[in-house]
Amino acid sequence: MSLLIEQARYHLSAHNARQLPDDGGYEVAFAGRSNAGKSSALNALTRQNALARVSKTPGRTQQLVFFQIQPERYLVDLPGYGYAKVPQDLQAHWQAFIDRYFRTREALRGLVVVMDIRHPLKDYDLQMLGYAAERGLPAHGLLTKADKLGRGQQMQTLQKVKKEVTSRFGDSVTVQTYSGESRQGVDELRGIVGGWLGLDGAPPAAEGEPGQAP
């Protein structure tokens, strides 16, 4: 499975619904605040240093970016949200586009919400998780930059976030800790994403794996 994910290549960028690929197959979307480490997580997932552009200026992703793994197997990088310098009219366009994508996209099989472990579950994070819940889609909370906290603080935050999302969304949301610096949690993330994409030999990550809340 990991070798298949490593085949991901840039496919297209969509600024509006007309530019989306045909609605078939399997897609996993990645959402997150502009400085949460979304692009870095995509690069680590695929073992590529520059698949998703990592910018020093938050909010540079201004469209839905599709990375193709196999025919009709895509990773989708959503625009980063919550960055004040993005013009309001552009924010409104993104909001309407993403809303339509979540409500109508049949190929969408799961959502990864990328959150800085030090600042999890902001309003937009909860909104994204709510989109998935409304569609009955599984979601996965990726608590990035775990290396910034000690092990005890990591586990405390993990359990707190798990409790909060369970109270709001039931058992459709899983959560794990992750660090791009130490590569903590990369295999767990691959298990989740690979399972949603239906890749050969990619079973979903099991309950209680290291880095995940039970």
UniProtKB/Swiss-Prot annotation:
Matches recorded under PROSITE patterns: G_ENGB (PS51706)
Which Pfam families is this protein grouped with?
MMR_HSR1
For this UniProt record, the keywords arranged alphabetically read as follows:
Cell cycle, Cell division, GTP-binding, Magnesium, Metal-binding, Nucleotide-binding, Septation
* Sites where the protein binds GTP: 32-39, 59-63, 77-80, 144-147, 178-180
Domain EngB-type G: residue ranges: 24-199
- Asked if the keyword Cytoplasm belongs to this entry, the reply reads no
The cofactors named for this UniProt entry are: Mg(2+)
- Work out whether the entry's keyword set contains Nucleotide-binding: yes
**Gene Ontology MF, one:** metal ion binding
- Gene Ontology annotations of biological process type: division septum assembly
Residues given in the record as Mg(2+) binding sites: S39, T61
InterPro entries given for it?
A: G_ENGB_dom (IPR030393), GTP-bd (IPR006073), GTP-bd_ribosome_bio_YsxC (IPR019987), P-loop_NTPase (IPR027417)
One Gene Ontology term, aspect cellular component: cytosol
Record-stated family: Belongs to the TRAFAC class TrmE-Era-EngA-EngB-Septin-like GTPase superfamily. EngB GTPase family.
Function summary: Necessary for normal cell division and for the maintenance of normal septation.
Name listed for the protein in its UniProt record: Probable GTP-binding protein EngB
Q: Which organism is it from?
A: Xanthomonas axonopodis pv. citri (strain 306)
Gene behind the chain: engB
